[in-house]
C-alpha cells in the first residue's frame, strides 16, 4: 500500500502564520544523505587565502498571501561547496549583514550523512557566531586574504542581501581585485545589491534557480504562497544572462564567477570551485 504524503505546507509554531515545506515536497527534494563525492585533492592549498561566506540571517520570507515561508540557507548548497573547498585547503569565515547567527533550512539537513554532518558540527560555531559584514567590508583592501566570496542558496538569500550596501561593497571589492565569486540557486539574488550603483557584473552569464520553477513550488506546498518578486527577472534587468531555464544540476564558469542552478549542483560547484581556486592559488 502506497502512503500518500500531504502537499499542505507544515506549520512552523515558532512564528505566527509561518510554514515549512509540505511532507510531499520534502520527500521529493530532500534526502538524509547528500551526493557528496569526488573529494580528491592530493595537493591542497597551504597558504593564507580563505573564503568569505555571506550567509542569511533572517528566517521568514513573506509570500503574496501574507503567509511566511520558514527558510534560510539551504544546508546542501552551503555545506557541499565548503566541504570541497576546505578539503582543497581553503579555510572559511562567515559573515551576515547583522552579525547575528546564520539561519539554515534544517528541514533539508542531510542528518544521516557521515561526512557532511561531522563537517557541519566542526564548523557550527562559525555559523552561530559570524562576523558583521560591515566590519569585514571596512577592513577590505587589495591585500585582504579572502580569495573568494561565497553566497549560498536557499530562499533566505532573498531577504536583505539584495538591498544591502555592504553586500554590494563586498562584491565590488572581489571583482575589482580579481577574486572569485561563487554562488548557486537563490544565492545570486545577492548580486542585485549592485543594481543601484556600479554594476561590474553587467554582461556576465550565470546559472541560478529559474523563476519558472519558483512559480510552481506552491503547487506542491514547498512554499505557503507565491513570491512577491522574482530575482531572475531583476538580474536580467541589470544586464545578467541566466543560461538555464530548468534544474539539472548545471554549473557554469564565466571568468571568476562560478555558479550553479540548484542544490543538485552543489557537489559539482564545490568541485569546480576547488579546482579553479587551486589552479589560481597553487604555489
Swiss-Prot record:
What is this enzyme's class at the first EC digit?
A: hydrolase
Q: What are the inducing conditions?
A: By heat shock.
InterPro entries assigned to the protein according to its UniProt record, in alphabetical order: Class_I_gatase-like, HchA, Prot/Nucl_acid_deglycase
Q: Which UniProt keywords apply?
A: Cytoplasm, DNA damage, DNA repair, Hydrolase, Metal-binding, Stress response, Zinc
The EC number(s) this enzyme carries? 3.1.2.-, 3.5.1.-, 3.5.1.124
**Reactions that this protein is recorded to catalyse:** N(omega)-(1-hydroxy-2-oxopropyl)-L-arginyl-[protein] + H2O = lactate + L-arginyl-[protein] + H(+); N(6)-(1-hydroxy-2-oxopropyl)-L-lysyl-[protein] + H2O = lactate + L-lysyl-[protein] + H(+); S-(1-hydroxy-2-oxopropyl)-L-cysteinyl-[protein] + H2O = lactate + L-cysteinyl-[protein] + H(+); N(omega)-(1-hydroxy-2-oxoethyl)-L-arginyl-[protein] + H2O = L-arginyl-[protein] + glycolate + H(+)
Give the UniProt entry's GO cellular component terms: cytoplasm
Among the record's GO biological process terms, what is one? DNA repair
UniProt key word Cell membrane: no
Q: Which Gene Ontology MF annotations are present?
A: glyoxalase III activity; protein deglycase activity; thiolester hydrolase activity; zinc ion binding
Residues the record lists as binding Zn(2+)? 86, 91, 123
Q: List the active site.
A: 185
Could you tell me where this protein is found in the cell? Cytoplasm
Q: Which family does it belong to?
A: Belongs to the peptidase C56 family. HchA subfamily.
Q: How does it assemble?
A: Homodimer.
Q: What does this protein do?
A: Protein and nucleotide deglycase that catalyzes the deglycation of the Maillard adducts formed between amino groups of proteins or nucleotides and reactive carbonyl groups of glyoxals. Thus, functions as a protein deglycase that repairs methylglyoxal- and glyoxal-glycated proteins, and releases repaired proteins and lactate or glycolate, respectively. Deglycates cysteine, arginine and lysine residues in proteins, and thus reactivates these proteins by reversing glycation by glyoxals.
Q: What is this protein called?
A: Protein/nucleic acid deglycase HchA
Amino acid at each position: 500500500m502506497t502512503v500518500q504524503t500531504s502537499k499542505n505546507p507544515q506549520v512552523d509554531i515558532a512564528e505566527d502564520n509561518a510554514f515549512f515545506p509540505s511532507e510531499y515536497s520534502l520527500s521529493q527534494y530532500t534526502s538524509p544523505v547528500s551526493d557528496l563525492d569526488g573529494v580528491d585533492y592530493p595537493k591542497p592549498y597551504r597558504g593564507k587565502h580563505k573564503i568569505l561566506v555571506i550567509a542569511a540571517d533572517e528566517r521568514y520570507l513573506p509570500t503574496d498571501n501574507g503567509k511566511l515561508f520558514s527558510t534560510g540557507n539551504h544546508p546542501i548548497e552551503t555545506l557541499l561547496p565548503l566541504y570541497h573547498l576546505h578539503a582543497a585547503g581553503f579555510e572559511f569565515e562567515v559573515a551576515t549583514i547583522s552579525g547575528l547567527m546564520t539561519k539554515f533550512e534544517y528541514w533539508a539537513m542531510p542528518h544521516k550523512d557521515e561526512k557532511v554532518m561531522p563537517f557541519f558540527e566542526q564548523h557550527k560555531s562559525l555559523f552561530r557566531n559570524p562576523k558583521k559584514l560591515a566590519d569585514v567590508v571596512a577592513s577590505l583592501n587589495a591585500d585582504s586574504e579572502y580569495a573568494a566570496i561565497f553566497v549560498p542558496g536557499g530562499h533566505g538569500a532573498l531577504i536583505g542581501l539584495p538591498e544591502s550596501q555592504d553586500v554590494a561593497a563586498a562584491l565590488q571589492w572581489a571583482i575589482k581585485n580579481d577574486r572569485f565569486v561563487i554562488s548557486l540557486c537563490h544565492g545570486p539574488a545577492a548580486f542585485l545589491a549592485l543594481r543601484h550603483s556600479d554594476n561590474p557584473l553587467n554582461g556576465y552569464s550565470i546559472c541560478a534557480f529559474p523563476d519558472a520553477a519558483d512559480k510552481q513550488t506552491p503547487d506542491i506546498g514547498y512554499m505557503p504562497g507565491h513570491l512577491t518578486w522574482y530575482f531572475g527577472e531583476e538580474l536580467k534587468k541589470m544586464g545578467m544572462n541566466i543560461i538555464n531555464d530548468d534544474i539539472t544540476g548545471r554549473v557554469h564558469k564565466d571568468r571568476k564567477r562560478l555558479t550553479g542552478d540548484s542544490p543538485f549542483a552543489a557537489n559539482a560547484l564545490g568541485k569546480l570551485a576547488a579546482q579553479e581556486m587551486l589552479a589560481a592559488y597553487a604555489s
